[in-house]
């Protein structure tokens, strides 16, 4: 299937698109002071072969010597492919003729170094510290300062005993991000929990960190999954571009007479039903070799016979019958290549073991039938403790992280002179959800299995001088696009949450409205975050909702397609 290659951010030159290999080539190490057992041997060799790093003269690299700040920025500029000719730095202690002046100026322009105060000092000949290096590398990824400023409320994991927010308020979040992205580690294998932030980084350590950064910066998403469910037909032409697709056409239910059963019809006001003309969609997926999975939804809070459905499902008596209901449907409908389990609402950790047992039994049953895929959608662990990420990752082929719909449906108070800040998927919350699902101990161990869900809902608040509606409404993307196009609304982008919103007056009913939604900028921020965490890809909820315009920051589909 034809894929659009991901455009490298921040102006990577074409020569840098060639992967830097772990064992770069058969060429010998040009530096005689780099031992063969150095942890950075391959990294130093790769960087040297491409002219990104040079030695200190006389055939020496200076393996264990400290790395100067100016040399680090020069190496970063080469790695990023920045244009450095003719650039003049603002730093008062870097003369125009300095060999790294252009690189330092480029780093200033990128917001990586510098100060809002006039006449700052860069200290080019000082040795760079490990904290300074981590900070510069994360800034080079383009993470906004405003978004980072929100991390204090959601990030509490501290992998290093010598790095706390109180000790290092300006660099703490950058160090934590560098750790989460795999750019930094503990200082040595023997001291994995010590980072030594104020210690000088050696040239050996610098090469290793720079190469880890390069791999994160140039990483690519490989899996584009999409849901076809309610009102998706209008975007059926996007199906060929998907890696796989889930048809949300079934709901697991219970009846007192028959126990668990799979509802694929409109009975019981079921929105998750196989639609009329579904054969066209299944045929389209088959013709384009897009694997089709059956989505199985369960409302865990729904009552049946006075019992919560989740409790009925997860009991030993009904588990096997639930699995049989799913596999029987697959056996009778060969168009499907697997199943996506979407059981939402397990708040208590008491559900972890029985839900994992259900997935394990389903996995065994699917394997006995042939080559069927098993996907599982999970919510953020911050709010739902009933999902054992590590165990689910061992059973499922893909795990879809539903880090969205954070906006409340109601507000206890709403002032007519304030903007309600209710982003749908705040950057810091998405970050935390990704951090938890990729946790080395409790998360999905194979990160390539994880897909970040991108949802395209909206939330709208309306009020007048006399009345404030504290219950949220919605707006469709056509209306949003029209208001942006005709100038009848004010557009804003909240940098802290990396989310857009509109503010407008509706003269048809005399209301002031605020609409939070997703656009190409907010989606790009999430896709980049998915890349930095090293997960497999993204999942779209859902076809029929993905904004697909050419302007007004609503070229969302093209933005997503550019990653694949």
Set out the residue ranges of the language-model regions.
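Feature responds to low-complexity, polar/acidic, surface-exposed segments characteristic
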Residues: 7, 15-41, 49, 54-105, ...
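Glycan-recognition patch characteristic of GH18 chitinases/ENGases
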Residues: 220-320
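An active-site-proximal structural segment forming one wall of the substrate-binding cleft
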Residues: 234, 314-339, 358-361, 365, ...
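Conserved, mostly hydrophobic/aromatic
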Residues: 245, 341, 399, 452, ...
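Substrate-binding surface in catalytic domains of secreted glycosidases
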Residues: 254-276, 352-480
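Active-site groove signature of glycoside hydrolases
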Residues: 323-353, 401-405, 410, 539
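Glycan-binding loop/region signatures in secreted carbohydrate-active enzymes
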Residues: 449, 456-528, 555-564
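Acidic/aromatic/glycine-rich contiguous surface patches that form carbohydrate-binding/processing clefts
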Residues: 526-564
């Amino acid at each position: 299937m034809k894929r659009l290659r991901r455009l490298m951010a921040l102006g990577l030159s074409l020569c840098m698109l060639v992967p830097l290999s772990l064992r770069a080539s058969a060429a010998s190490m040009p530096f005689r002071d780099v031992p063969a057992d150095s942890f950075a041997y391959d990294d130093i060799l790769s960087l040297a072969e491409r002219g990104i790093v040079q030695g200190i003269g006389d055939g020496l690299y200076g393996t264990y010597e400290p790395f100067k700040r100016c040399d680090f920025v020069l190496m970063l500029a080469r790695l990023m492919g920045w244009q450095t000719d003719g650039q003049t730095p603002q730093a008062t202690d870097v003369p125009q003729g300095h060999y790294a002046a252009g690189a330092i100026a480029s780093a200033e322009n990128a917001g990586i170094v510098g100060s809002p105060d006039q006449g700052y000092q860069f200290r080019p000949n000082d040795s760079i510290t490990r904290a300074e290096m981590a900070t510069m590398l994360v800034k080079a990824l383009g993470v906004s300062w405003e978004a980072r400023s929100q991390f204090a409320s959601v990030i509490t994991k501290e992998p290093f005993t010598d790095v706390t927010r109180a000790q290092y308020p300006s660099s703490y979040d950058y160090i934590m991000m560098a750790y989460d992205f795999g750019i930094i580690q503990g200082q040595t294998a023997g001291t994995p929990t010590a980072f030594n932030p104020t210690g000088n980084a050696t040239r050996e350590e610098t090469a290793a960190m720079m190469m880890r950064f390069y791999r994160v910066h140039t990483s690519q998403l490989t899996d584009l999954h999409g849901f076809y469910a309610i009102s998706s037909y209008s975007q059926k032409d996007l199906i060929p571009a998907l890696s796989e697709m889930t048809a949300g056409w079934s709901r697991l239910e219970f009846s007192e007479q028959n126990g668990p059963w799979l509802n694929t019809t409109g009975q019981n006001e079921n929105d998750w039903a196989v639609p009329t003309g579904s054969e066209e969609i299944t045929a389209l997926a088959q013709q384009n070799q897009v694997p089709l999975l059956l989505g199985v939804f369960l409302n865990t809070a729904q009552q049946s016979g006075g019992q919560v459905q989740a409790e009925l499902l997860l009991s030993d008596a009904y588990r096997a019958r639930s699995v049989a209901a799913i596999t029987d449907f697959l056996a009778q409908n060969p168009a499907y290549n697997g199943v996506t389990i979407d059981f939402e609402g397990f708040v208590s950790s008491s559900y972890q073991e029985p839900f994992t047992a259900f997935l394990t039994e389903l996995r065994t049953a699917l394997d006995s039938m042939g080559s069927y895929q098993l996907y599982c959608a999970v919510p953020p662990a911050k709010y739902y403790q009933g999902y054992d990420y590590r165990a689910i990752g061992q059973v499922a082929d893909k795990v879809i992280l539903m880090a969205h719909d954070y906006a409340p449906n109601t507000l206890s108070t709403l002032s007519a002179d304030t903007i309600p800040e209710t982003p749908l998927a705040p950057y810091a919350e998405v970050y935390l959800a990704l951090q938890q699902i990729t946790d080395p101990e409790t998360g999905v161990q194979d990160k390539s299995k994880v897909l970040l869900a991108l949802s395209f809902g909206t939330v709208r608040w309306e009020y007048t001088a006399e009345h404030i509606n504290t219950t949220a409404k919605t707006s469709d993307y056509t209306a949003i696009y029209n208001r942006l196009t005709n100038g009848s609304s004010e557009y804003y982008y909240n940098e802290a949450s990396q989310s857009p919103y509109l503010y407008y007056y509706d003269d048809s009913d005399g209301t002031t409205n605020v609409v939070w939604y997703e656009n190409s900028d907010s989606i790009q921020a999430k896709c980049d975050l998915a890349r930095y965490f090293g997960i497999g890809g993204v999942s779209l909820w859902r076809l029929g909702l993905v904004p697909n315009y050419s302007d007004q920051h609503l070229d969302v589909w093209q933005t997503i397609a550019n990653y694949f």
